[in-house]
Regions:
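Phosphate-handling substructures
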Residues: 72-132, 187, 195
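Short basic (Lys/Arg) and small-residue
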Residues: 154
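Active-site-proximal alpha-helix that buttresses catalytic centers in soluble enzyme cores
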Residues: 5, 13-76
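Active-site signature of alpha/beta-hydrolase-fold catalytic machinery across serine-
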Residues: 69, 160-164
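Acidic, low-complexity terminal tails and accessory targeting/binding regions
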Residues: 1-6, 76-79, 87-99, 142-147, ...
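Surface-exposed helix-capping loop/turn segments at secondary-structure junctions
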Residues: 49-53, 141-149
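Short active-site segment of divalent metal-dependent hydrolases/proteases
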Residues: 15, 157-158
Length: 201
């Protein structure tokens, strides 16, 4: 049987200020809400039976805090990978969708017209994030043949990883749901085949 690397891909827990108003946090180091911290403790029980060999996490607190909780429970030390952080959105950081549509209507329109390549002033494009995240994932996969690893990252980052796994275009970014503290499972086989076992679980 072809050896595989299994990645358990997690989105961080609920953040402070989460609610019905959608907001771009990006590189802003937003903390976890009380519910978000509880979500990690619930998740660690779900993962208890998985033979996790390594744990990699974004450097932002909403991921790194949870990685410490999960790592302590699973017996692995989190490795911080700054390249796994969320897409930087420059001058949009911290603003709600409604605020952006009001304050930057032209930028909002331009991004919707080309979601893959448009770069907010001071920020990154989806393609930029793909170019910094996927080499890290490829390295993790190669390093852990025959093992299972845990990756704690962000909604946008996870969507890019999942789209890459199924060979879908980056323009389909928002066709994949990623709720707080959700679990995705991807098997990477040495022959190049990839199987997505779970999405947003």
């Amino acid at each position: 049987m072809t050896p595989k690397t299994r990645i358990h891909l997690i989105r961080h827990g609920e953040v402070e200020g989460a609610g019905p108003v959608r907001r771009y946090n990006g590189h802003t180091d937003v903390g976890l809400s009380e519910r978000g911290r509880r979500q990690y403790h619930t998740l660690k029980e779900r993962l208890a039976a998985a033979p996790i060999a390594a744990l990699y996490t974004s450097d932002l607190t909403r991921c790194a805090w949870g990685a410490e909780v999960l790592g302590s429970h699973l017996g692995v030390t989190p490795v911080i990978i700054p390249e796994l952080r969320e897409m930087g959105v420059g001058i949009w950081e911290g603003k709600s969708w409604d605020e952006l549509m009001e304050q930057y209507p032209d930028q909002w329109r331009d991004r919707l017209a080309d979601i893959v390549n448009y770069r907010v002033p001071g920020g990154e494009s989806v393609l930029d994030v793909h170019r910094r995240v996927m080499p890290v994932i490829d390295e993790i996969v190669a390093r852990h043949r025959g093992e299972e690893v845990l990756v704690v990252a962000h909604g946008g980052v996870n969507r890019i990883i999942l789209l890459n796994a199924i060979g879908a275009p980056l323009s389909s970014l928002f066709a994949i749901e990623q709720t707080y503290c959700c679990l995705n499972i991807i098997d990477y086989f040495a022959d190049g085949n990839t199987v997505v076992k779970l999405v947003n679980g």
